[in-house]
Amino acid sequence: MNATPASADDLIVIGKIYSVHGVRGEVKVYSFTDPIGNLLDYKTWTLRREGSVDKQVELVSGRLQSKFLVTKLKGLDDREEARLLSGYEICVPRNLFPDLDDGEYYWYQLEGLKVIDQLGQLLGKIDHLLETGSNDVMVVKPCAGSLDDRERLLPYTEQCVLAIDMAAGEMKVDWDADF
């Protein structure tokens, strides 16, 4: 494992190591990719945990097991050494992500956008998104200049999202501010 050469701003979290698997140094991983197996397409990971130095690791193999992945990392052959990686986020440089069609966005691109209703009122900024099964949900938290100090949950649907202006850092929504 090496110190990572990638810039911290360039890295996007795509998963998290949450425990060990077996006695040979394999780790269980929650994947944030869709489908979850896409995480295995990235062979070099930067592992990050608050208060620790980033580590660069190489993926040797991985397999789907229920709702998580079991992965083998190069040079990690011991259960106790693998246990030390629990809690690390798995990051990759954003330039490795596939290009999307027009009108499609990665979640990290939406986070931080100002959310403005049809009346021009600032509802807040997108803090993060949740996957609910039926549709994704944006968690909109108040920010400087917000209409009020309420947190809102807005569906990421065509009916709600009217327009996204990445250059302006804004999303226009069809949403009643009283909700």
UniProtKB/Swiss-Prot annotation:
GO MF terms held by the record: ribosome binding
All copies of domain PRC barrel, residue ranges: 102-179
Function statement: An accessory protein needed during the final step in the assembly of 30S ribosomal subunit, possibly for assembly of the head region. Essential for efficient processing of 16S rRNA. May be needed both before and after RbfA during the maturation of 16S rRNA. It has affinity for free ribosomal 30S subunits but not for 70S ribosomes.
GO biological process per UniProt: ribosomal small subunit biogenesis; rRNA processing
Record's subunit section: Binds ribosomal protein uS19.
Keyword Chaperone attached: yes
The keyword Repressor appears for this protein: no
Localization, UniProt: Cytoplasm
PANTHER family recorded: RIBOSOME MATURATION FACTOR RIMM
Domain notes: The PRC barrel domain binds ribosomal protein uS19.
Keyword terms, alphabetized: Chaperone, Cytoplasm, Ribosome biogenesis, rRNA processing
Protein's organism: Pseudomonas syringae pv. syringae (strain B728a)
Descriptive protein name: Ribosome maturation factor RimM
